[in-house]
Each structure stands twice: as C-alpha cells, then as structure tokens.
Amino acid sequence: MLKINVKKQLGQLALEANLQIPARGVTALFGLSGSGKTSLINLVSGLVHPDEGYISLNERVLVDQSKAVCIPAYQRHIGYVFQDARLFPHYTVKGNLCYGIKKIDLAKFDDIVSLLGIGHLLKRYPITLSGGEKQRVAIGRALLTQPEILLMDEPLSALDLPRKRELMSYLETLSKKIDIPILYVTHSIEELLRLAEYVVLLDEGKVRAFDRLESIWENPLFLPWKLEDEQSAVLSLPILHNNTGYQVTALGLQQQQIWIKAQQAEVGENIRICIKGSDVSLSLTQPEKTSIRNILHGKVKRIVERENRVDVQIEIDEKPIWATISKWALEDLALQLGQPVFAQIKAVSVL
C-alpha cells in the first residue's frame, strides 16, 4: 500500500494530499490541467520533495520531513513511464529494456516481452518504432527494474487514436497480470473508464474525492466531466455464466442479472458496463411479450427535473441506474420516491 500525506507549494498551487492507495490495480489521478496530478506522482517518485509530510510504500518510509528522511529516487523501487517514451536512440529495444539492470531475470524478461507484445521489436532501434511501440518498450523497461509500484504520467497523450486504443488494450491486460499498484495520471474519460479501479479527483491541488470509479461516476463533483444532456451509470459486475447458443453473457446483481454480448472471460471475472439513461424506459407493471431482454425491478431513488427532460435514478439490487424520461411520462406514471418500477434496458455498453 502507498500512503501519502504531504503538502507542497508549487508557485500559486498549494498541493495537499492524504491518501492510501490500494496495493494492486489501477488508481487514476484525474482532474483538469494544472490540478496537481503530475506533481503528486513526482512527489512519490522522489523527483520533487514535499515541504511537509511523509510518503511510505509497503510500510517502507520514502520520505518523512519531520525526521529529515528522504530516500533518493533511484533507491525507491519505483517504475516511472513518462508522456514520451524517453528511449535511448543509440540502443536497440533490447538494449533499452536491459539498460541499468545488473542481472536480468531471463524468465521475467520473456514474460514481460510476451505480455507487451514486443518480442519482434528487440533488434530494432527507437527511430523505427511507432509511438505506441515506444511506449510499450518504456513500460517494459520500467517493469524489468522490478518496482513495487508503477507510475504512469499520461502515457497515451501523445498517441493518435488507433495507437492509443491499441496500447490501452495492453494496459488493461497488464493491470490484471502484474501484482503491483499502478498510479495513472490522465484527464481522459475513455482511459478512466477502461483502466481505473479507483479514482483520485484533484482540483487546484486538493483531493476532492477518492473512491472506486463506480462511486466517483455518481459523485456530484464529477458532473463537469459528464455530458450535460445525458445521465448514465457505470457498473462493475461479475460474470454468472455464458450462453453459447445465443452468444450472450449474464452479469450478476444480487438477485437479478443483466445480459450483454458474449465475453471472452471466465465466470466470476468482473466486467465493467455503462448504461445510458436514454436507453432505459420505465413501467409500473412488468412488461410481457417484448424483445427487450433486460427488464429489472427496482425502486425510485431520485427524481431530477431538468429543462427538457426528467432523470430518474432507480436502485436495482443496491446499484444505481438512470432512466431519462419526458415530463409528460413523469406526470402520467405519477412517480414517487420509493415507488417500485420496472426498468427496461434497451442497450448496454461494455467498457
């Protein structure tokens, strides 16, 4: 676990953070440009020193200003992947991967090369690589130092969309395979939804919220990053079973299930989905003889009337789902808080 309790004055920005980052998985630092995201991971890495406070990693103190303790960056056992790959142009890919490592664990080397899909690049030089390939090599180099945590500072920001999505797939696999935490800086909603398990929401140097992604998505502080004309819910649910005949997969709620297109994943593995309010309609009675496969019962939790629509939050097995309806429909159904309803979900997006 990474424990952070620091203060740092950076020009006009007063950075303050008190966090306990989980021991594995991806924790995203999210916020506007200039909110302190990169500065915070630079404090963790040792590239910047705090004015006050301490940082510890797996109970090992990295810095404690009250005791004048400050471990140098190169002794912190931290891997850092920057926005640009920062490869040595005169070394091959293999040379870059092995740079600065006294003794290479060949089995680990092969595993990382295979995981990142860079085996065919080992004899090539950085000038011949695409942006995505360079970043995969940079990630491999960081992992081969056997770090206790991996810091990633917007590693996809310099890539075009196809390369970005290609590398994101590798990062998804990487986050599930390696047994260390990843602290990931981004201001991209797509990256957040695809990669993050936990989110630190930063604004003007302050931690405004820290929670699982699904909870942050519902947090009012996150509203500036969501589409104004649409509500949505993000859920992470386990696979119950796969129906090979119909090519669909069932995800489990407490007492109900949600059907999605077939997934190449094991039973019990969590799948993250997004349900848009515009894809959900409501009924006071259970619909019959309908083509809609996902019909779930729940209770009205919130009613938010807007200028040209009404957003109704339904609690289904303790999970929030939004339905966007008209004011006419609200009056016709006479919806009240706590009222039982059936939610008809027309579409589910897998993230």
Swiss-Prot record:
Binding site for ATP: 31-38
Membrane-spanning residues: none
Keywords of the record: ATP-binding, Cell inner membrane, Cell membrane, Membrane, Molybdenum, Nucleotide-binding, Translocase, Transport
Gene3D superfamilies per UniProt: 2.40.50.100, P-loop containing nucleotide triphosphate hydrolases
Superkingdom of source: Bacteria
SMART domains membership: AAA (SM00382)
Entry keyword annotation includes ATP-binding: yes
Gene Ontology molecular function, alphabetical: ABC-type molybdate transporter activity; ATP binding; ATP hydrolysis activity
GO cellular component: plasma membrane
Subcellular location: Cell inner membrane
InterPro entries: AAA+_ATPase, ABC_transporter-like_ATP-bd, ABC_transporter-like_CS, Mo/tungstate-bd_C_term_dom, ModC_ABC_ATP-bd, Molybdenum_import_ModC, Mop_domain, P-loop_NTPase
A Pfam family annotated for this UniProt entry: TOBE
EC number: 7.3.2.5
Membrane topology, record value: Peripheral membrane protein
Catalytic activity: molybdate(out) + ATP + H2O = molybdate(in) + ADP + phosphate + H(+)
Mop domain ranges (all copies): 289-351
NCBIfam families (alphabetical): modC_ABC, Mop, PRK11144.1
Function: Part of the ABC transporter complex ModABC involved in molybdenum import. Responsible for energy coupling to the transport system.
Subunit structure: The complex is composed of two ATP-binding proteins (ModC), two transmembrane proteins (ModB) and a solute-binding protein (ModA).
Family per record: Belongs to the ABC transporter superfamily. Molybdate importer (TC 3.A.1.8) family.
Name this protein carries in UniProt: Molybdenum import ATP-binding protein ModC
